[in-house]
Amino acid sequence: MTTAAIIVAAGRGTRAGGDLPKQWQPLAGRPVLAHTLAAFRAAAGVSRTLLVIHPDDRARAEALPGVAEGKVELVEGGASRDASVRNALEALAGAGIERVLIHDGARPLVAPELIARTLAALETAPGAAPAVPVSDALWRGEGGRVVGTQDRTGLFRAQTPQAFRYEAILAAHRAHPGGAADDVEVARAAGLEVAIVEGCEDNLKVTYPGDFARAERLLALAAGL
């Protein structure tokens, strides 16, 4: 089956610190996005890779491995995350794509096994996404004080890539009013069933300064350093 990967990297998040959005900050000598793109370019069965960028980042994006050679296609994002994803989905219309993976550009440590596991789940459901069960105690707070606890039974921390049958998720995005937290929310609003796939703790989203140090340690371990 023909599969495309959409890497969403149009955000301007600054919680990681620094002068650049987190996906453009250096990680082990390369931009975070370079690691993310490498994972999908190496993934089995992915025939097209689209990188969704902010218009201001085009020059940076054109310098990434795979872009100049045409192996990574650039798509400009929209005013929100779901608008950015829809732009990429529309760019694939009529191309014969059957499955699509949608991934946060700031998750550079996604493993090929996780990509394969998520795609395999599409054999039994129109959508699939990795997640990790919540293991910590959960509190509710007000004014800096604990006011209650939350049962964590059945709660998961969502990850990406989130995989879908292409035509189904395209129709779901076209029908959605906007404002979704992720593509699973868009899919469920359209009545699509989404299978939960076993996620991975190492598949972190680099969001805060400490995340970069952890990601560098994991990359070093993977390289046997």
Swiss-Prot record:
GO biological process per UniProt: isopentenyl diphosphate biosynthetic process, methylerythritol 4-phosphate pathway
GO MF term (any one): 2-C-methyl-D-erythritol 4-phosphate cytidylyltransferase activity
EC nos: 2.7.7.60
Source organism, top-level taxon: Bacteria
UniProt keyword list: Isoprene biosynthesis, Nucleotidyltransferase, Transferase
Site residues by UniProt (Positions MEP for the nucleophilic attack): 152, 205
Metabolic or biological pathway: Isoprenoid biosynthesis; isopentenyl diphosphate biosynthesis via DXP pathway; isopentenyl diphosphate from 1-deoxy-D-xylulose 5-phosphate: step 2/6
Pfam families: IspD
PROSITE patterns, per database record: ISPD
Family: Belongs to the IspD/TarI cytidylyltransferase family. IspD subfamily.
Signal peptide: none
Keyword Nucleotidyltransferase: yes
PANTHER family registered for this protein in UniProt: 2-C-METHYL-D-ERYTHRITOL 4-PHOSPHATE CYTIDYLYLTRANSFERASE, CHLOROPLASTIC
Positions of the record's site feature: Transition state stabilizer: 15, 22
Source species: Cereibacter sphaeroides (strain ATCC 17023 / DSM 158 / JCM 6121 / CCUG 31486 / LMG 2827 / NBRC 12203 / NCIMB 8253 / ATH 2.4.1.)
Function: Catalyzes the formation of 4-diphosphocytidyl-2-C-methyl-D-erythritol from CTP and 2-C-methyl-D-erythritol 4-phosphate (MEP).
Protein name: 2-C-methyl-D-erythritol 4-phosphate cytidylyltransferase
Reactions accelerated catalytically: 2-C-methyl-D-erythritol 4-phosphate + CTP + H(+) = 4-CDP-2-C-methyl-D-erythritol + diphosphate
